[in-house]
């Protein structure tokens, strides 16, 4: 029988300069308030203002950015957390589960995990991710790392190519190639808060954004017991020691997830489904009337008291009652959002409570809103309509293709930095400018100080005498480039690409 005690999970210590001694309820809450301040005031949150949700480079302020989306997710996460705590209180289980003095931190961790959940996303969202991964795959050919004979290996980076008689180094080469070809926004988020920005958040707060538990260098299929939790890469080779320590501090078994992350995930699922449809109406991709008919058609036949009738039809009818004095669009989405939240939030909260033993252990291998219920079907309805009528719209597809080209082009522009021999690049890092490398010097100067320092620190910890040194140095050099380009906003990436391609007016 699993003993559920959240005092063992809500760890308020930090990696550096951690508070010591036994803390009162108020003192622990203050520690998490410090986390809130660090997160809300971070540049990574501010950059979300100019990162896309669905429509890249959008000038209409009514259409969501990653920041406005994240604020909405934060509110839904708070709602779910409060609902869970309220239900546990009604059952006199708060003290039993060690939450009687941790309700404030519980809510705060969920809220800030929601606010941070997208900070690692590159410009142009999933198409930015795809561009980064495709560019590196075309050079590193990670699938060839299993090839026999070794001469079949097509990797164009000589020091990462497999070599006869070097099995230990070959295993590292395989890991590095796989890792670099699996850039992922969630894994980059972990790298941002720990390695790049050194936010020194509490262990519990970082645990809240470790959405997937698969390392980026993983090869083959994940175990069936964790196939959902390991659906995508959750962290990179560069953060492996930190994640190992995180698991220890949060009492997490290998490939297990922190309990409050399920709440963040549910809040994101609820928020973006309605928001994407509302943004599509704002962009005139379809009208409210057309959206209603799309939803009606996709759901199919239903009875009067069905969930569809209670949520979608109810919103439609109410919006028309007030249509004389208010915008039908605004009214419809207000009621649709309220109705959706009032149904899905209690369901998510109850699913959390019903599966608390597995969730506490970190092994619940599903999303909270992934079941055979009508609530899950409603969420799928929103997603399917958006997929069919929004994401496949010519304007959206054109912008995504442009975004893909921009990110691919920027990587190609900065490729000379990856082509430099180790000794020359080390000299460039030290002196910042070399006359014999005018192009590389100018490109290096453009990299942000934060990213350069992260590279210098990582390489400085390596033993230069080790045979692994050239491989790992190149790995961190590639990370430097991925960090810089993924940290750009959509607009900055677009402008930088135009400037460097000499297409600016």
From Swiss-Prot:
Its cofactor is Mg(2+). It comes from the Bacteria. InterPro entries: dGTP_triP_hydro_central_sf, dGTPase, dGTPase-like, dNTPase_1, HD/PDEase_dom, HD_domain. Coiled coil: none annotated. Its EC number is 3.1.5.1. GO terms for molecular function: dGTPase activity; magnesium ion binding. One of its GO terms (biological process) is dGTP catabolic process. SMART domains: HDc (SM00471). It is an enzyme of class 3 (hydrolase). It catalyses: dGTP + H2O = 2'-deoxyguanosine + triphosphate + H(+). CDD domains: HDc. Residues 66-273 form the HD domain. Keywords: Hydrolase, Magnesium. Belongs to the dGTPase family. Type 1 subfamily. PANTHER family: DEOXYGUANOSINETRIPHOSPHATE TRIPHOSPHOHYDROLASE (PTHR11373:SF32), DEOXYNUCLEOSIDE TRIPHOSPHATE TRIPHOSPHOHYDROLASE (PTHR11373). NCBIfam families: dGTP_triPase, PRK04926.1. Homotetramer. dGTPase preferentially hydrolyzes dGTP over the other canonical NTPs. This is Deoxyguanosinetriphosphate triphosphohydrolase.
């Amino acid at each position: 029988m699993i003993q559920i005690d959240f005092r063992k999970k809500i760890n308020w210590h930090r990696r550096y300069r951690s508070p010591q001694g036994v803390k009162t309820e108020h003192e622990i809450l203050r520690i998490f308030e410090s986390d809130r301040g660090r997160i809300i005031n971070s540049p990574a949150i501010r950059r979300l203002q100019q990162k896309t949700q669905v429509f890249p480079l959008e000038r209409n302020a009514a259409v969501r950015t990653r920041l406005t989306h994240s604020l909405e997710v934060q509110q839904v996460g708070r709602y779910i957390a409060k609902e869970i705590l309220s239900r546990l209180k009604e059952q006199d289980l708060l003290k039993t589960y060690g939450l009687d003095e941790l309700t404030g931190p519980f809510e705060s961790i969920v809220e800030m995990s929601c606010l941070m959940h997208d900070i690692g996303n590159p410009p142009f969202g999933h198409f930015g991710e795809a561009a980064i991964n495709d560019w590196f795959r075309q050079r590193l050919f990670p699938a060839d790392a299993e090839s026999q004979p070794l001469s079949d290996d097509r990797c164009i980076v000589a020091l990462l190519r497999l070599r006869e008689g070097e099995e230990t180094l070959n295993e590292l080469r395989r890991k590095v190639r796989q890792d670099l070809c699996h850039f992922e926004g969630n894994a980059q988020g972990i790298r941002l808060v720990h390695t790049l920005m050194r936010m020194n958040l509490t262990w519990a707060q970082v645990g809240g954004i470790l959405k997937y538990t698969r390392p980026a260098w993983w090869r083959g299929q994940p175990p069936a017991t964790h196939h959902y939790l390991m659906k995508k890469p959750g962290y990179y080779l560069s953060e492996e020691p930190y994640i190992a320590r995180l698991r220890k501090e949060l009492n997490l078994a290998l490939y297990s997830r922190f309990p409050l992350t399920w709440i963040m995930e549910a809040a994101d699922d609820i928020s973006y489904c309605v928001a994407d449809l509302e943004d599509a109406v704002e962009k005139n991709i379809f009208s409210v009337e057309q959206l209603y008919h799309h939803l009606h058609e996709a759901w199919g036949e239903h009875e009067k008291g069905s969930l569809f009738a209670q949520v979608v039809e109810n919103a439609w009818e109410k919006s028309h009652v007030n249509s004389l004095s208010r915008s039908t669009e605004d009214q419809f989405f207000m009621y649709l959002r309220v109705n959706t939240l009032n149904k899905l939030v209690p369901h998510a909260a109850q699913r959390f409570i019903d599966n608390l033993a597995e969730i506490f252990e970190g092994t619940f291998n599903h999303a909270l809103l992934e079941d055979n219920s009508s609530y899950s079907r409603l969420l799928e309805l929103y997603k399917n309509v958006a997929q069919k009528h929004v994401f496949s719209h010519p304007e959206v597809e054109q912008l995504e293709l442009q975004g893909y080209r921009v990110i691919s082009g920027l990587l190609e522009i900065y490729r000379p930095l990856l082509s430099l021999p180790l000794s020359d690049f080390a000299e460039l890092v030290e002196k910042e400018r070399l006359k014999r490398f005018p192009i590389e010097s100018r490109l290096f100067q453009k990299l942000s100080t934060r990213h350069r320092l992260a590279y210098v620190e990582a390489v400085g910890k390596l033993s230069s005498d080790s045979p692994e040194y050239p491989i790992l140095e190149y790995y961190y050099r590639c990370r430097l480039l991925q960090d810089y380009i993924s940290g750009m906003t959509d607009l900055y990436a677009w402008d930088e690409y135009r400037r460097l391609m000499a297409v600016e007016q």
